[in-house]
From Swiss-Prot:
Alphabetic keyword roster: Ribonucleoprotein, Ribosomal protein
Gene Ontology biological-process entries: translation
Name used for this protein in its record: Large ribosomal subunit protein bL35
Gene that encodes the chain: rpmI
GO molecular function terms noted in the UniProt entry: structural constituent of ribosome
One Gene Ontology CC term in the entry: cytosolic large ribosomal subunit
Length: 66
């Protein structure tokens, strides 16, 4: 059976940590900033850790070689 390919869109959006957690960047910072408050924009910075159940699905289906 051939190896599973990694989804190229997923490898750009998600990163697997050394402990096996999945981290991702916050969404909603590309355009339309004028209608958001400074607090909302500030809170969208940085990365988040995905819930374990969702992270396991990402690894299994989209990042099999990750």
């Amino acid at each position: 059976m051939p190896k599973l390919k990694t989804k190229s869109g997923a490898k750009k959006r998600f990163k697997i940590t050394a402990t096996g957690k999945v981290i991702y960047a916050q969404s909603g910072k590309r355009h339309g900033m004028i209608k958001r408050t400074n607090k909302q924009i500030r809170n969208l910075r940085g990365t988040n850790v995905m819930f374990k159940s969702d992270g396991d699905k990402i690894i299994r289906f989209f990042l099999p070689n990750g």
